[in-house]
Regions:
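ABC transporter nucleotide-binding domain
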Residues: 176-265, 292, 509-522, 527-598
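Conserved short beta-strand edge segments in small beta-sheet-based binding/regulatory domains
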Residues: 282-292, 616-625
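ABC transporter nucleotide-binding domains
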Residues: 3-5, 12-208, 214, 336-540, ...
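Short amphipathic alpha-helices in soluble, non-transmembrane regions
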Residues: 243-245, 273-279, 576-578, 606-611
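Conserved protein kinase catalytic domain
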Residues: 76, 120, 222, 241, ...
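Non-catalytic alpha-helical coupling and interface elements of nucleotide-dependent molecular machines
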Residues: 103-106, 226, 249, 279, ...
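ABC-family P-loop ATPase nucleotide-binding domain
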Residues: 1-11, 272, 276, 280-281, ...
Length: 649
């Protein structure tokens, strides 16, 4: 079978910068190829060259047998390209948007209606065909854009980080659609910042500084991992990570949610030493065991070994500075943030409904919820930007309705879309925010020096902000938001679209801030990041449906058990397993499946029998502690069932 996508030694230069350096890859029909790499690695540039939007400096590429440079018209007839920015018309309905794209692609009138209806059914969007696109959630917009891209029946689908900023429920739906496309022999090339998504691809390429460092199946990529991984599960994973790093006994230490991975050449000795260290410090842990490497383990390790880990770690000097700046900023025993029955309506629509919670000083409080659940609305009210319709709230003792200007003086705020000025240099952005916060003279110079040290951008002080990668912009935006040393900081999806290395280092800083007494209020769609919070609240349709520590939510919320299932092609068996008695739901999870079941022993037996009937080898199946993603999805679905009157029966 001929490749549907074929690239040979693709190079793209912008002046003296080589953005893509000799990339060669191929993707066959009915195959998903995942392109992963740090910010600025060249993923988007590669996709743009393959879609004939951008001309390569040298090298060749073909789409469905057509040359991307000399036959761009035929290339565009055979591809669907979905960029990171929505290409939707928000004042048009779902149906009108799809019909408009059908016009653009020249889809014949005969059979068009049936084609659109098929795609709407295919994507579960038919119930919303009359809804205005601007009124859709982020996840539904992603699905609509995909439907628009598929209306002309392309042979190749190019997706540039399609699930960035999308909640886990919507991500699961999106990937179900992608797997259905494989049955139609579509070749899919997807760039992603989610390494668990890359686990689901047939093949993966690791791109860094424009070059492919490795490519192959996920299993082949994992074999690049040198050394064994010892896994420690703990409710205080961040403290465990710090302890293990300070011991200097391990080649690498990384945290994944509530689990710490130690890279070592001597598995037995490493596990025993870790146990001694944990017991000597009195840190809780559930288990210490050998762990098969994940793609994220390999991703981080390969980048470090090749010296291409991108943004360097926060320096100890910049992190320790928080111990001075946060001291004594919140009254002892008083919550830093407190709200009671907080409500916000927009006309007849209630965006936030009688929300109540309090956040002690120095705590990391995570706010989770699907797109459009009300997270950003709550943050805007707490920041004094939006007045509540009802209820009360205080930040540092200041009333959010009566003293919004006082609140703004004492908080830091970092939005989803980094509030930076692209036409200013790095240092000019810092100076601009220093002026907003009334910093001047020696104090401004001290804070500028601190910000440059903290971000690691000293060598890029005069660079235009627009040329920075997302990881660098993230650091600069954070530095600007805390330049005035606020005791409370609000972070609204601060790591959306940022690569795993940058995300991990960003959370190092958040932890250091909290240890210094800074209160951090953060929203996120990365369920792994939710594990790093001291407490969590899940908001859905404007209501808080659960609140507690990550451990409490994982052990007390779910009434059913989780079976972790691994086989060669999980997407081919998931629908069959989902129809078995006693199985409520089956979803893709990393490289395998998670099945939600009432009786794990009985359901497990039926699942084994189903694998035998399908003649598919079952690699392994075991009951596991629910992940935060499992809990998140279960709470959303339970709320939906309750509100639809189906209950639990």
């Amino acid at each position: 079978m001929q490749p549907a996508i074929l690239a040979r030694n693709l190079i793209k230069q912008f002046g003296g910068l080589t953005a893509v350096d000799g990339v060669s890859l191929e993707v066959r029909p009915a195959e998903i190829y995942g392109l992963v790499g740090p910010d600025g690695a060249g993923k988007t540039t590669t996709l743009r060259m393959l879609s004939s939007i951008m001309t390569p400096t040298s090298g060749t590429a073909e789409i469905a047998g057509y040359d991307v440079q000399t036959q761009s018209g035929q290339v565009k007839d055979n591809i669907a390209y979905m960029s990171q920015r929505f290409g939707l018309y928000e004042d048009l309905s779902v149906w009108e948007n799809v019909n408009f794209y059908a016009d653009l692609y020249g889809v014949p009138a005969r059979g068009r209606k049936e084609r659109i209806e098929d795609l709407l059914d295919f994507s579960s969007m038919r119930p919303f065909k009359g809804r205005r696109a601007g009124a859709l959630s982020g996840g539904m917009k992603q699905k609509l854009q995909l439907v628009c891209a598929l209306v002309h029946t392309p042979k190749v689908l190019l997706l540039d980080e399609p699930t960035n900023g999308v909640d886990p429920v919507s991500r699961r739906d999106f990937w179900r659609i992608l797997y259905r496309l494989l049955a139609r022999d579509v070749a899919i090339l997807v760039s992603t910042a989610y390494l668990d998504e890359a686990e689901r691809c047939n093949r993966v390429g690791l791109l860094s500084n424009g070059s492919l460092l490795a490519q192959g199946s996920p299993a082949e990529i994992k074999r690049l991992m040198k050394g064994a991984i010892v896994s420690i599960r703990s409710s205080q994973a961040r403290r465990v990570q710090t302890l293990m790093e300070e011991s200097g006994s391990y080649e690498d230490v990384n945290t994944f949610g509530d689990t710490v991975h130690l890279v070592t050449q001597d598995e037995a000795a490493a596990g025993q030493q870790a146990k001694v260290l944990l017991e000597s410090e009195g840190l809780p842990f559930d288990e210490i065991s050998r762990q098969e490497p994940s793609l994220e383990d390999v991703f981080v390790r390969v980048l470090k070994e090749t010296g291409e880990a991108g943004v360097r770690p926060w320096s100890s000097e910049s992190r320790s500075g928080f111990h001075d700046q946060a001291a004594g900023l919140t009254a002892p025993g008083r919550p830093a943030v407190e709200v009671e029955d907080l409500t916000r309506r927009f006309g007849s629509f209630t965006a936030v409904n009688r929300v109540s919670f309090s956040v002690p000083a120095g705590q990391i409080f995570g706010f989770l919820g699907p797109n459009g659940a009300g997270k950003s609305t709550v943050i805007r009210m707490l920041c004094g930007v939006l007045e509540p319709s009802e209820g009360r709230g205080e930040v540092l003792g200041f009333d959010i309705a009566r003293q919004p200007e006082k609140i703004k003086e004492h908080i830091g705020y970092m939005s989803q879309r980094f509030s930076l000025y692209d036409d200013l240099t790095v240092v000019e952005n810092i100076e601009f925010y220093g002026g907003i916060y009334s910093l001047a003279g020696k104090r401004l110079e001290e804070r500028k020096a601190w910000a440059m040290e903290m971000t690691g951008l000293a060598d890029h002080a005069r660079s235009m902000t627009r040329v920075l990668s997302s990881g660098w912009k993230q650091r600069l935006a954070m530095a600007c938001s805390i330049l005035h040393e606020p005791p409370v900081i609000f972070l609204d999806e601060p790591t959306s679209g940022v690569d795993p290395v940058s995300r991990r280092r960003f959370w190092d800083l958040i932890s250091a801030m909290a240890e210094a007494g800074v209160t951090v209020f953060v929203t996120t769609h990365y369920m792994e990041e939710a594990e790093y919070c001291d407490r969590l609240a899940l908001i859905y349709r404007g209501n808080i449906v659960a609140m507690g520590t990550p451990t409490e939510l994982k052990t007390r919320v779910m009434r059913e058990a989780i079976l972790d299932i691994h086989c060669l092609r999980p997407f081919e068996v998931m629908d069959s397993i989902a129809e078995l008695p006693g199985v409520r739901e089956v979803a893709l999870f990393g490289s395998g499946l998670h099945a939600v079941v009432r009786d794990p022993e009985e359901a497990g037996q039926r699942i084994r029998q189903e694998f035998e009937r399908l003649d598919v080898p079952l690699e392994r199946m075991e009951q596991v502690v629910p992940s935060m993603e499992d809990v998140f999805v279960a709470l959303i679905e339970e709320t939906d069932r309750r509100e639809s009157g189906q209950g639990e029966g």
